């Protein structure tokens, strides 16, 4: 089973794949696939390759339902019992994969039709986790994955210095008064402007992850053992093999895309640093140094929209109080989800199945621990689709549910395809779809949805709206790139366990221009404070999604016949845009992503030019604002 999680919004996506704990890219050095040295005695194939692929689809159909169900139960009701069920299910799924991968080797030199060849590629390349040869290592790998996710999901920071996980550390931690989970700590990061309060929340959450630093190092060993058993140098080589291009070419492509957007990011970082320095003082935010990581409104400094009030170009002009409107209108989780559903229905797509409303978890239960990380699920690869999200009436959750339903509608669009084709064209596509929809949440759309009364259109309002969007979209780009850059080097062995933390902060400073707010050491494990590390979820997909969503948005706006600046376009209520979107979704993973991109938007290459077009007004404004300043770090 795959998990796809979007960065800022804590968005997880569970769909068909081959593993519960997920990974995606890695290391340096030689990355071409090599002929594997195997311990399995390979006999001549007993069935044709077409029969083998048909059998693989059937086995995955059964295994996916069983495994997804076990993971759903665990993430929506975290106990020792459900953790055991989850781990055992993961182990069975890994063994199913191991069996299929072993048989797939028999057909390496077999000629195939294009359709069969694509299914075979989907089965054998780009796998996010490959099972080791030894059964005991498969069991250990599955158990470690469950353990790390469980620690993260149930973790609490207690002021008395205990982790609070078992609630037995003190009288205060027994009643929960002195302990805060990630949701509570994230609220502090989002809303407080007190330097010391923010520092306490940041250091508190980052004190959790050292618990599984050693487990993570062992997990890497086992994951690499599995990758080597199937002919890859390390797991990262497997990850990079899944993009319908040579692995080295993929790395080059990611770097090319970053080069396109890097100047805009650096301009944004310079302006934000200057405004934070005005608020906190130059002693706390020097104008020629990286920004302290706890001051950007987010636990990971990955998206900065929560500090908008400190950097707003023209205070109060054209402000959109989505949170205030949701609270005033008493919109609950179902009502908010209905608004998002209506967006897709307006494009000509189907209503959500009734089972969605019966089986989804849209609010946080009061009686148990759950993984609140918002996630979209397809349980049976047919019509049993669900959302797991702890929805509250605020802007972030409102945007998140639009994004999550993008995943759900992707599931529904390709649910008639064989299992090996039930996926995004590549993993960035799945994340991009939800965010493409979010780009259409314009002031005009919000007015049609009844959440604002009037739309203010002038240059100052435009710059404000673009700044708010850039704090989310542009601020994210280097973070989206660097997580797997770190992980690639961990998999390849270039980064040793004893250097995990030092190398993490080197990359964060290099790309983001941020720094740890307090002294860090190798007793810390700051990379592990991010869910996607704990749960081994790939991350480069989110960087790619941020590029693709603007490409998709431009193409859909063209289909809708929109005339005007790209940032003003909403495809809401456009059946023509809906048709093009459906074409993009329905292909699933049945063909190379380049073919899907060509059919949908007329190009075979990912490109960031649409981002630059979208943010052209802000880019010019930032250039003016930064004149005479020392930018960089």
Report residues per predicted region.
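Post-HExxH zinc-binding segment in Zn-dependent metallohydrolases
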Residues: 254-264, 424-458
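Active-site recognition of the HExxH zinc-binding catalytic motif
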Residues: 396-412, 431-435
């Amino acid at each position: 089973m795959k998990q796809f999680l979007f960065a800022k919004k804590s968005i997880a996506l569970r769909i068909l794949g081959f593993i519960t704990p997920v990974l995606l890219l890695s290391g340096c050095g030689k990355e071409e696939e090599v002929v594997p040295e195997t311990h399995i005695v390979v006999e001549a194939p007993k069935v044709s390759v077409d029969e083998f692929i048909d059998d693989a689809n059937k086995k995955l159909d059964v295994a996916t339902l069983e495994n997804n169900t076990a993971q759903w139960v665990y993430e929506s009701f975290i106990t020792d019992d459900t953790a055991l069920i989850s781990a055992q299910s993961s182990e069975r799924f890994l063994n199913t994969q191991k069996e299929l991968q072993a048989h797939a080797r028999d057909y390496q030199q077999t000629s195939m039709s294009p359709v069969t060849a694509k299914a075979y590629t989907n089965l054998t390349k780009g796998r996010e986790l490959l099972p080791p040869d030894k059964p005991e290592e498969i069991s250990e790998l599955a158990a470690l994955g469950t353990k790390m996710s469980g620690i993260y999901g149930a973790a609490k920071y207690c002021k008395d210095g205990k982790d609070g996980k078992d609630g037995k550390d003190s009288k205060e931690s027994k009643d929960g008064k002195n302990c805060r989970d990630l949701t509570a700590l994230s609220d502090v990061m989002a809303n407080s402007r007190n330097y010391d309060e923010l520092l306490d929340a940041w250091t508190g959450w980052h004190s959790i992850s050292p618990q599984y630093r050693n487990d993570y190092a062992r997990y890497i060993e086992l994951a690499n053992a599995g990758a080597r058993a199937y002919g890859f140098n390390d797991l990262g080589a497997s990850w990079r093999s899944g993009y319908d291009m040579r692995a080295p070419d993929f790395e080059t492509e990611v770097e090319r895309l970053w080069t396109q957007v890097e100047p805009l990011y650096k301009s944004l970082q310079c302006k934000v640093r200057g405004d934070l320095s005005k608020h906190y003082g130059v002693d706390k935010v020097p104008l020629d140094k990286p920004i302290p990581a706890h001051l950007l409104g987010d636990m990971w400094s990955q998206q900065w929209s929560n500090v908008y009030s400190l950097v707003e170009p023209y205070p109060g002009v054209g402000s959109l109080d989505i949170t205030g409107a949701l609270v005033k209108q008493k919109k609950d989780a179902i009502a908010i989800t209905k608004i998002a559903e209506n967006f897709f229905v307006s494009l000509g797509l189907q209503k959500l199945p009734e089972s969605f409303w019966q089986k989804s978890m849209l609010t946080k239960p009061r009686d148990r621990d759950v993984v609140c990380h918002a996630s979209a699920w397809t349980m049976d690869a047919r019509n049993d689709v669900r959302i797991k999200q702890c929805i509250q009436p605020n802007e972030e959750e409102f945007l998140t549910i639009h994004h999550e339903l993008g995943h759900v509608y992707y599931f529904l669009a390709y649910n008639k395809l064989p299992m090996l084709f039930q996926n995004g064209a590549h993993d960035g596509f799945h994340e991009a779809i939800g965010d493409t929809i979010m780009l259409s949440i314009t002031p005009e759309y919000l007015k049609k949805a009844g959440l604002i009364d009037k739309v203010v259109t002038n240059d100052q309002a435009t710059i404000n709206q673009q700044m708010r969007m850039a704090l989310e979209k542009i601020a994210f780009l280097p973070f989206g790139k660097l997580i797997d850059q770190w992980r690639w080097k961990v998999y390849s062995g270039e980064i040793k366990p004893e250097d995990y933390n030092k190398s993490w902060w080197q990359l964060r400073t290099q790309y983001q221009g941020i720094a740890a707010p307090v002294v860090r050491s190798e007793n810390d494990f700051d990379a592990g404070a991010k869910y996607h590390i704990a749960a081994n979820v790939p991350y480069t997909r989110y960087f790619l999604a941020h590029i693709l969503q603007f490409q998709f948005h431009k193409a859909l706006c063209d289909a809708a016949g929109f005339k005007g600046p790209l940032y003003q376009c909403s495809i809401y209520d456009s059946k023509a845009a809906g048709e093009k979107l459906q074409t993009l979704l329905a292909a699933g993973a049945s063909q190379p992503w380049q073919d899907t991109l060509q059919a949908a938007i007329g190009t075979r290459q990912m490109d960031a030019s649409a981002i630059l077009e979208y943010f052209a007004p802000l880019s010019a404004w930032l250039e003016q604002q930064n004149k005479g300043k020392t930018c960089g770090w």
